[in-house]
């Protein structure tokens, strides 16, 4: 069996997107953003949404054109061949698979600060912001639970995720209302200081490193589940954009409530000194909102677990998709004959999740790595969708975006800027993690006797030079972003925009009608035939 079951409607797919976005990001993101940017963290969330929206629009057109499992790791291969397709797919998979352990870490970290006398033992689960041996054991159990809920069928996943996501929307809503009503301090938004007490550069850094990009990363989950969508042409764009907007409203309101609820004395020496183990629960305890404390500690399991369950599903489809691209062993392309899920891919991702869990035991470190790896994978979306407008003119497009010739380059530039805002040396460190995957690509190229390698490498080499250019600019850039200050603040971002535009043009000209585009056309024609049959059935 090698065909996935199409059972998910628009609502289920939107819940997948929301379920991916409202995880540990809401439990920790507002605190980290406020710590970095102060009250201006509200602006950071809006900037982050705009950046991700421009990227998501490109992927929405692609997702509606090619409704297949693990689509996010396949699209670039259709437009530029296997070399850059592998880099983008590998970066995307690294970013997504590492979300699974970070959600487990978040649950255990909240658990470590349980205030009840009978639960004092939980304080030993976390020391200095990282999990202890006992903490790792609890997190490992959570990983197994995520795995088992996806093991049998997509129906079980879909039902469990929709229920969990509804719960995850209600709890942030209750938190927002309670904090605004009981303990709102309007002076926290100015307090005699600038709204951006740490400078406007910190507002930009917060977008990249506080968990904002990490939180919005879930927009791609409906795209990766497109192979199981009943009507992907309609469902994918609605699910992607709809879940992004709903999540933004929730996150902005949470940020406002968090900033207003902090005791002014706690920020007397600056927002950077604000330290919490369980941010919203700690605020609820300080304000004596006892019912909210209990609800938040319960949600600290539900929200991250819901996201962990979602990503366990989507990452298995990504490995399934990478096998179809000939980047992974054929065993990962097999589906269970009854349940229609890629179990071997799920086992592989479970092992990788354990590796990430034991190597990176803190939420903050994992969130930063995920954010930068995500940005590297995102930059190919605008390139691919515009290239296919030229090389795949005959493809059926259920969603054909107007103004894409403006949206796509802006999305590419915005993603480049956020990558730069992540600060040196983090940008260089994550780039190294991405490059680790190249030996896998070269191994499978050698097995194929380097067939077509020259053309594929030529079409994708711009990506290598782009990443190197970003590294150099980050290293020499403003000291506000961790650089040597050879390129001063302001001019550094102008340079990033100009360099990005040059690489954008180079990338578009590098695209060609790849051999993989034939497979894409087959998927696309099946979509057209399916919609034609559905229309005929209504008559």
Swiss-Prot record:
Gene Ontology terms for molecular function: symporter activity
GO biological process, one term: amino acid transport
Keyword Cell membrane: yes
Transmembrane segments: 11-31, 36-56, 82-102, 137-157, 164-184, 199-219, 238-258, 283-303, 350-370, 401-421, 424-444, 457-477, 486-506
Protein's cellular compartments: Cell membrane
Keywords: Amino-acid transport, Cell membrane, Membrane, Symport, Transmembrane, Transmembrane helix, Transport
Main location: membrane
Stimuli inducing this protein: In the presence of glutamate in the medium, the expression is reduced five-fold, at high potassium concentration (5 mM). In the absence of glutamate, expression does not respond to the supply of potassium.
Organism superkingdom: Bacteria
InterPro entries in UniProt: AA/rel_permease1 (IPR002293), AA_Transporter_AGT (IPR052962)
UniProt key word Membrane: yes
Membrane topology according to the record: Multi-pass membrane protein
Disruption phenotype: Loss of the gene confers resistance to both serine and its toxic analog serine hydroxamate. Deletion mutant is still able to transport serine, but the deletion of the three permease-encoding genes aimA (ybeC), ybxG and bcaP results in an unprecedented resistance to serine up to 100 mM.
Database matches in Pfam families: AA_permease_2
Any one GO CC term of the record: plasma membrane
Protein family membership: Belongs to the amino acid-polyamine-organocation (APC) superfamily. AGT (TC 2.A.3.11) family.
Chain's role: Major glutamate and serine transporter. Cannot transport threonine. AimA is the major glutamate transporter under standard growth conditions when glutamate is not limiting in the medium.
Cross-referenced PANTHER family: ASPARTATE-PROTON SYMPORTER, PTHR47547
Protein name stated in the entry: Glutamate/serine transporter AimA
Lineage: Bacteria, Bacillati, Bacillota, Bacilli, Bacillales
Gene: aimA
